[in-house]
């Protein structure tokens, strides 16, 4: 019997906050370049804008409205969202995550990914992290592409149909949505809480 180990992406294989911070830096750079009447240099404006965005985020405010107000801009939220959603991050897996994936592959495990989110964002993260070294593209289920979100059974049943008679394990971080379906289907589950 072979083993299939599927992972969640955000806050399991990578920290979602790292994506958010790197995307915010890109947005801050974009906004700073559009601030024609600002007295600070673009680099200083980028740094201040990034700090302002993080403040707004942590206070639960609309980050993009706060950024526009801070810089005196009227950039459409859609423009900011386009940058956020299409941003190509440049970060790497933590060494211990790479070591784990290497060990699982060496042990003959088939690795998969089950992740909620927008296709472009999740694929950009997948590619930036180099996950294709361990996970075959056919073993990636992203909710927007697949047509259902966790905790739908369908996302997990996909792997059960693809690999009949395998032993399945799911590794995730969200007790509210990551474990209902795999537990119901008899999978082993591992919860990583931060």
Language-model segment annotations:
Residues 85-112:
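Short, acidic loop-to-helix structural element flanking the phosphoryl-transfer center
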């Amino acid at each position: 019997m072979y083993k299939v180990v599927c992972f969640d992406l955000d806050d399991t294989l990578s920290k979602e906050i790292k994506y958010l911070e790197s995307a915010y830096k890109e947005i801050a750079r974009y906004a700073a370049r559009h601030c024609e009447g600002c007295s600070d240099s673009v680099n200083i404006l980028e740094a201040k804008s990034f700090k302002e965005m993080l403040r707004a985020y942590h206070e639960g405010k609309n980050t993009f409205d706060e950024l526009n107000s801070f810089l005196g801009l009227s950039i459409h939220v859609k423009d900011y969202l386009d940058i956020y959603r299409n941003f190509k991050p440049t970060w790497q897996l933590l060494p211990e995550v790479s070591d784990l994936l290497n060990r699982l592959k060496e042990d003959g495990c088939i690795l998969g990914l089950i992740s909620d989110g927008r296709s472009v964002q999740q694929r950009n993260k997948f590619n930036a992290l180099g996950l294709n070294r361990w996970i075959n593209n056919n073993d990636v289920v992203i909710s927007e592409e697949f047509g259902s979100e966790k905790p739908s059974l369908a996302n997990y049943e996909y792997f059960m149909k693809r690999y009949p008679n395998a032993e399945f394990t799911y590794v995730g971080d969200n007790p509210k949505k990551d474990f209902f379906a795999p537990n119901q289907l008899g999978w082993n589950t591992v919860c990583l809480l931060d």
